[in-house]
Amino acid sequence: MLHDARLIVDDIEKLTIKPQQFYVLIDEVRQENKQIKVRLLKEREHFIFPPRFAWLSFDSDSQKYCPGQRWSMQLRLRAVHARLNEGEFDNQRFALANHTPLQGRIMRQDVESSACSWRWQFIKHHEAQIGFLSQQATLKALAFGIRDDLSKTTRQLLRDTGTAHLMAISGMHIALAGGVEWLLARGIQFLLPAHRIGYLFPLIASWILAATYTWLSGGHAPAQRALLALTIWIATRIAGAQLNGWQIWTLCIGLLLITDPLTVLSESFWLSALAVGMLLIWYHWFPLPDRFHQRRWLLLQLLHLQIGMMILMAPLQVTLFNGISVTALVANLIAVPVISFITVPLILLAMMLPFSSASVLTWWCADSTLRGLVYVLTLLPTGWWPLHNASLLALLVWGGLIIWRGQIFFSAPFSCGAIAIAMLLSRQEKIEQGWRIDMLDVGHGLSIVISQGREAILYDTGPRWKTDDAGGRVVIPWLERKQLQLQQIILSHKHLDHSGGLESIKQRWPQIQVRSALNNVEHLSCIRGTQWQWKQLHFQVLWPINASASGNNNDSCVISVDDGKVRLLLTGDIEAIAERQLVALEKHNLNVDIVQVPHHGSRTSSSSLFLRSLNGHAALASVARYNAWRMPAKSVLENYQKTGFNWFDTGQSGQISLSINNGKMRVATLREQLMPRWYHQWFGVKRESR
């Protein structure tokens, strides 16, 4: 793995130095987001091996790309750099695990081959047939591995019922495709003379359909892993080798790690590998009695399987997804047979039928099964149970089963008891004394959490994006992971990079209080002179003088927060004009220890007069590495450092956390200190500032 990591880091450094000419193959198109995923085959005349992938942005709506096309492009590439917060999906690790360490824009392009891939043409042909169906997005996910069109409501339903795994083409789907073809091949053999019947034809036919299904699904990693396992199993049968399940499992894992060491960064790899391992353990340790192996006990066999998966996979689900679905057992007992034995076979049949009318009818039948399934799943009670920071508790499941099955308790009772007590004591989390400041990494925007004990106040809610916002994507998962109860939201001003996540947070906590200077009758006041006490912290509003409906930068609500020993200044997006008035009005209140850098470090803010008035120690800036304005400005950063501030920003460090107790302050950054993994590095060129 170290060798592959070094190679990918070297390639990032080499390919992002300057604009370069590449020969690329288009791998995926997201027309709505104006993005294409390309495989970098050559840099000028030099082949790139192993090939690297990059996501490219394009501007023109008239430009139509399709997978399979080959282009000569001049690209300005840059290293992937994702937001980094506790509790948020690790996009940077995901990008490196999938060999997509680059992103960029197209400067010039010339088409070398305009032909679209057969897969793309096949998908477009069938998309026209299912365009009128209500479950077309789910059908596309099951048939072609395209999950981008799944609605937020559908994703939520799948998560809450523990059935999301059914929408990712993986081991179950590939094995099912192979099994369907094996049955068809065996049926054909009944029509042949006895001397023509052999065991090879069904095996080879099943592998061909499984490989075709893998190709149609886009060749994503879970499908490839399943095909590799099936290939090994078929090869051992043809060769006459006698390998048990554990031997095939270890052989698959070994081959995967040899061919792609970076796959260890993939959550889907661990889910796939451990799911199969858990099944082997379950059937080895807790097998059904022989009398229940007959077909009439199929429902009992399925129940036995689902119980095993629910128990043994619970620790991994809690660790990766911070929760489990308590309705998963019932939901999967319904969904797995429907998807496995009805929906997927109908989809495979629809794709194989040569006549459009028959194909459309079969698609409609598959859609009907999904409509019925969705209806039944919506009748189940909301089943998602958040379990944050419960990894050690989840390990008790595995440890308990091992101790019970191996009868270790009887041979070493004191050791087992000591381990159990130690694990239970580790759950006694100490509530942190003092108070905390956490600047979340929301990209270009702002969101700061001030917390005492198990309660928190939020200053700004982060930005809104095209299809999502920082409230739902960052703030809520972070608060839930930290088990904090949100008491109040303070909006500095109206701009969407500060208020974009408000609606998502209000949907989660409808009764939450909001404070602002926006002339909103539903909001608490946030104008100069307003002050309140929250536990040991005193809040005092220093600016603006009057409320304003416009909510521009200079109308930002500036607040001083202190415990009598350490003072924090929250500034929103005020600029030099407001800074001068603030210094004139509140100079005695500006002697602070910590300042939130105004307006993301723009040159229009952080004037020399303002900085001299602060006399602080830590400056916190919320910025995105690749923001369009190249903030923070180099001159602003240098001025803070010359004035004696220690500079921290989310673009460089991800989430920034400060613990304050009895006048002492400790700063911890996620990228450098809390999660200092090699794949979280700042790759590529140094900071691009103006």
Which residues make up each language-model segment?
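Hydrophobic alpha-helical transmembrane segments in multi-pass membrane proteins
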Residues: 104, 154-329, 386-432, 605-609, ...
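Hydrophobic alpha-helical segments of integral membrane proteins
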Residues: 114-130, 138, 146, 154, ...
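Aromatic-rich juxtamembrane segments at the membrane interface
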Residues: 97-228, 235, 532, 539, ...
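Membrane-interface helix/helix-cap signal primarily in integral membrane proteins
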Residues: 2-165, 469, 473-477, 481-485, ...
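Non-globular, low-confidence helical/coil segments that flank catalytic cores
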Residues: 61-79, 94, 291-296, 351-690
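Hydrophobic alpha-helical transmembrane segments of integral membrane proteins
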Residues: 199, 311-312, 333, 341, ...
